[in-house]
Amino acid sequence: MADVPKDAPEHCPGTESDKSGKVSACQGCPNQQICASSKPAPPDPDLGKIKERLSSVKHKILVLSGKGGVGKSTFTAHLAHGLAADEDRQVAVLDIDICGPSIPTVFGLQGEQVHQSGSGWSPVYVEDNLGVMSVGFLLAKPTDAVIWRGPKKNGLIKQFLRDVDWGDADFLVVDTPPGTSDEHLSIIQYLNQTEVDGAVVVTTPQEVSLLDVRKEISFCKKVRLPVIGVVENMSVFVCPNCKKESQIFPPTTGGAEKMAVEMKVPFLGRIPLDPRIGRACDEGKSFLSEIPDSPATSSYKDIIEKIVKYCVASQHQS
């Protein structure tokens, strides 16, 4: 056989065989481990189904953060609300924070359940043009803990992408867990088949957050995920009465803008700290429509406009 090395033991099955490195003839061969582990995995039949399912989704945006507690899910929700403010847009949100799903709460969808239709799982709709899917809809109680290892998380993410009927969505916004984990690798692996616009990375001004964001950006570069830009959340506190600005989290090393310059990625803007944002999320409401005159609302709208312009430009280039 042409695929049997010259120095191979007798009865070698060959390097291209399914039995390569696994039969008794392979015992003692110095190449046994290489042969046993180097067989390429068969193509995943679900990748084609995912590509077909998402072919009707124009733009796909991942929202990332290096650390928890920086307002990533809050930003995801208000990015979606801001996009859906245009009634001609269809917007979808996918929550892949499997172990800590907060998206149902910030959209006011706690207690909702997933429904099956002839074309797959149906998202839960906040508005006629804003649908949401989350593992939170699959839990019996909001307090139930999800204790899953990587393969099971991977399977659910695949099922969300393959089986949910997203329809003709203009934007799919994906809320991810903090850091870089199995969920990130899975979603990028699957979405790579479907032309992802890129990632928005959310941080706070202090160095302890920026340190992890640098790693997040490096991760994006390694997996060839474009970085749409960095958002500095909770940049300053603006007093709702006197409008005076105060730094709650001082940018000891120059903040997110300086870090973005160093990492050679775009800086999208700063969102000031407003306690009413937290209240709106707890109540499942859109802060942008509830408090339209807040400086934070203006910041959100400016950032969302930049993201839309980026996505439109990337669509024309592809």
Curated annotation (Swiss-Prot):
Pfam family, one: ParA
Required co-factors: [4Fe-4S] cluster
Main localization, broad class: cytoplasm
Coiled-coil ranges per UniProt: none
Entry-linked InterPro entries: Mrp/NBP35_ATP-bd, NUBP1/Nbp35, P-loop_NTPase, YlxH/NBP35
Keywords: 4Fe-4S, ATP-binding, Cytoplasm, Iron, Iron-sulfur, Metal-binding, Nucleotide-binding
Positions contributing to ATP binding: G66, K67, G68, G69, V70, G71, K72, S73
One GO term describing the cellular component: cytosol
Protein location: Cytoplasm
Compositionally biased region (Basic and acidic residues): 1-10
PANTHER family assigned to the protein according to its UniProt record, in alphabetical order: CYTOSOLIC FE-S CLUSTER ASSEMBLY FACTOR NUBP1, NUCLEOTIDE-BINDING PROTEIN NBP35 YEAST -RELATED
Known partners and oligomeric status: Heterotetramer of 2 NUBP1 and 2 NUBP2 chains.
Known function: Component of the cytosolic iron-sulfur (Fe/S) protein assembly (CIA) machinery. Required for maturation of extramitochondrial Fe-S proteins. The NUBP1-NUBP2 heterotetramer forms a Fe-S scaffold complex, mediating the de novo assembly of an Fe-S cluster and its transfer to target apoproteins.
Record's protein name: Cytosolic Fe-S cluster assembly factor NUBP1 homolog
Species, as recorded: Nematostella vectensis
